[in-house]
Swiss-Prot record:
Mn(2+) binds at residues 153, 155, 229. It comes from Nitrosomonas europaea (strain ATCC 19718 / CIP 103999 / KCTC 2705 / NBRC 14298). Transmembrane segments: none annotated. InterPro entries: DXP_reductoisomerase (IPR003821), DXP_reductoisomerase_C (IPR013644), DXP_reductoisomerase_N (IPR013512), DXPR_C (IPR026877), DXPR_C_sf (IPR036169), NAD(P)-bd_dom_sf (IPR036291). SUPFAM superfamilies: 1-deoxy-D-xylulose-5-phosphate reductoisomerase, C-terminal domain, Glyceraldehyde-3-phosphate dehydrogenase-like, C-terminal domain, NAD(P)-binding Rossmann-fold domains. It catalyses: 2-C-methyl-D-erythritol 4-phosphate + NADP(+) = 1-deoxy-D-xylulose 5-phosphate + NADPH + H(+). NADPH binds at residues 13-16, 40-41, 127, 129, 213. Belongs to the DXR family. The keyword Metal-binding applies. GO terms for molecular function: 1-deoxy-D-xylulose-5-phosphate reductoisomerase activity; manganese ion binding; NADPH binding. 1-deoxy-D-xylulose 5-phosphate binds at residues 128, 154-155, 184, 207, 220, 225-226, 229. GO terms for biological process: isopentenyl diphosphate biosynthetic process, methylerythritol 4-phosphate pathway involved in terpenoid biosynthetic process. This is 1-deoxy-D-xylulose 5-phosphate reductoisomerase. The lineage of its organism: Bacteria, Pseudomonadati, Pseudomonadota, Betaproteobacteria, Nitrosomonadales.
Amino acid sequence: MTKTRHLTILGSTGSIGESTLDVVARHPGRYQVVALTADRNVEKMFEQCIQFHPPYAVMLDAQSAEQLEDRLHAAGLDTRVLSGIESLEKVASLPEIDTVMAAIVGAAGIRPTLAAARTGKHILLANKETLVMAGRVFMDTLRQHHATLLPIDSEHNAIFQSLPQHFNGDLAGSGVRRILLTASGGPFRTVDLKILETVTPEQACAHPNWVMGRKISVDSATMMNKGLEVIEAHWLFNAVPEKIQVVIHPQSVIHSMVEYIDGSVLAQLGNPDMRTPIAHALSYPERMESGVQSLDMFKVARLDFESPDFKRFPCLRLAYEALAAGGNMPAVLNAANEVAVEVFLAGRIPFTAIPVMIEDVMKSTERRDVPDLEGVLLADLQARATAREWLACNIRQSTGQPGKPASSLSAGQ
């Protein structure tokens, strides 16, 4: 009989969190949800608490925590409601927890994910920033405390499934020639470059294959998402940048591939649904039903591949440059991107200004080593401050109106 796993889901109201709970609900008795966490989505958290009855619920925002507590009390639930980053760390390291789904988007997910690593948990990692910003710190912590890690990103999960079962971090010793990291190319893969200057947030968030949150949808449109995944792959699989090849694959059916020295290429295929990697990681080394439909190869009919265009997708180039530089630069890249995407979604800069802001912040930041979490978080804070300064210098303020993009912000000018 399969042992019941006790779960904390960090970021339960986001797309990954909801997909995780969908899979969990299909297997009653196999998983017990001990803690759910969110930022400020009280309504969705309330619904999840009603369905799963977790002993703990954490809202990062204190006011949202108060609202949730009132609603749960009125509903007769005895779920304990906590708030703040320290509470996220607490529920990620509870002694009764064995598995943590790390699905908080952004730098806010680093501290609770590290807390899970320090207490030897089985970590299902969907938070890119933990590896992008603090890869060395996080991997060292995993080893030191004998925590285990399985990737949730569909691409890294596909790579994991395509590597030898007992892969020990030695690609060459395992006969691996290179990793082929697939990318859909996003909604603007074939759009005229001039049109990109007028792209709206709604257009950028309309991914052709995947259903995702707004931030990651914009990252997919700029291919920064793929750039961050290159950095993740470096840490997850001990791969130098030259061994990680990005391949644009518009159908999003092949989720990634591993090429071996004998010429073999192993790939993981499936419908574009995050429940597949989630179910794989939740049940590993077994397999279980995810709710995902079978892949109809006759309906797919064809598989296309293209090389990425750095002119169209400068964010991908910037990610490779940050990885090559090392030290604080991946954290700087990530912080500048988070600010740029935030202000783009707010309508304050054009789509084409996102890579301009990121590159300017990177160029104005001195490369430094970051041996610990404090150094990583400091690099993050400083890069965000630099990005805000850049924004202040490049946005014209109009009385009574939101800031308007300056004409000089377009990448083509």
